[in-house]
């Protein structure tokens, strides 16, 4: 965020006087000059010296100390635009400590060098913005803190009015970034904590987290891997707060492509994902040792697949929303085999049940 600087440059107050002869007196005198200016004050050797006031037809006025015809020491300068400077002068220019108040309500208090803001100081803007820190040639420079009235603040390094180096931003929405800056943007190593508690750590470029990084969720989930536009993109690993681990591909922040999920309870899946859900082909191993291999949709067996139960029984055939549904073959522990239709997990419709060579039934079934 760039802040428009106050118009800090001042008119140099060195006065070029005209005329041939000047009084040698140290007493107070009044002089008028060819440029229309008036000086009322003390002189020495024909030059303004001591204390006096110099004014111009355009409304400019300086009152303060003089040495050999120049404003040197403490004084007050009033400008035609309504701005007022009060402080130290050297050779007719603000030098040292001084403060200026602008007609629009803006203020600066601090160090000056040759009529420019330079060194440590405080700038206050009409809109409530406040900067405290270093300046060089009227620009923020060095260490400084900028605070806006909407809650935004930056504390850190500045180079010629631009955030450059190490710093911390507190955003108006509650987010916070700590890290490196280049050309007013997050650039380099840094950490961003969003308003909802998500933490993004890694290398930034032009304000965006790119390449490999870390994303920490408020619930304790931690992602390490490739990132694009602040989201998981590419290959990475998530360690979930419950102990589960996912290793694989991501797209736009979702598990997508091929990946492996290792559950803390012994569950295991390896296969395809889409928008964060198990979808496509894969193999699922359950904590009890059962294994399903086949097609999935929205985290459930859907399409063609085979399950081998922990006790050795099997089913090969169609599935719908995680349930045996359609044509398939079940092999039971007692040696029986059924081939035919299923509905909602039960034998339903036409099918054939056999038990070795001793039993065979071929016909219709209803609800198992």
Stretch-by-stretch model annotation:
Residues 18-23, 27:
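Boundary at the C-terminal end of the N-terminal hydrophobic targeting segment
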Residues 9-17:
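Bacterial N-terminal signal peptides
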Residues 53, 76, 99, 122, ...:
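Extracellular beta-strand solenoid repeats
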Residues 30-40:
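An edge-strand/N-cap motif at the start of beta-rich repeat modules
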Residues 38-49, 61-72, 84-95, 107-118, ...:
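Conserved anchor residues at repeat-unit boundaries in beta-strand-based tandem repeats, strongest
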Residues 1-9:
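Bacterial N-terminal signal peptides that target proteins for export
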